[in-house]
Amino acid sequence: MAGHLGLLGFPVRLWARDPRALDGVAEAGGVTVDGVIEGFGRVETCSSLMAALDGADTVLVVVPASAHGDVARRCAPYLRDGQKVILMPGRTAGAIEFTHALRREGCAADVLVGEAQTFLYASRKTGPAAARIHGIKRQVLAAALPARRTHELLTGIKPAFPQFMPARWVWKTSLDNIGAIFHPTVVL
């Protein structure tokens, strides 16, 4: 996703819980993508979450659901009024968990938190600064918390992600989460 956004010309700052995970991207200055999208996308890496969030309009959180609370806790001191945080994907009630964690940490900023029903890309990391995009979904539901702000959330990201469509509320994106159905089946 970072490589694709960089390739499209969007300013991208990348932060990871393990800074070593970004060494290859930092060295290359971005991410090379191949597959249904081909090219090199410029990506800035940040070792500091404060630097990554500073001045960002939209924060895309792409981590396993088990990390939503931890990432929210780490973001809480640095988020500012007007920023949007979108969990990709939210999985089951991710936006609710993220919002509660921000409040627990004392974040008083007017931050709009939302979630996508699933990840937009079928992709895999193929190298330290490379990814293969096998496909991009045509439509993904997304919702904000509170639901009345979903239009505001989507207006800000439509230029980058025209595939996002409004869901009625985060319970729709959470309870229609295909990962909760698909992944346990594979294990069984």
Question: Model-derived features: where do they sit?
Answer:
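NAD(P)+-binding Rossmann beta1-loop-alpha1 motif at the extreme N-terminus of oxidoreductases
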Residues: 1-34
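A general structural motif
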Residues: 9, 56, 81-82, 110, ...
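Short, charged/polar "capping" segments at the starts of alpha-helices
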Residues: 20-25, 93-96, 150-152
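Short mixed-charge
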Residues: 29-42, 110
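Rossmann-like NAD(P)-binding element
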Residues: 36-86
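Rossmann-like NAD(P)(H) cofactor-binding subdomain of soluble oxidoreductases
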Residues: 65-127
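Internal alpha-helical scaffold of NAD(P)-dependent oxidoreductase catalytic cores
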Residues: 127-188
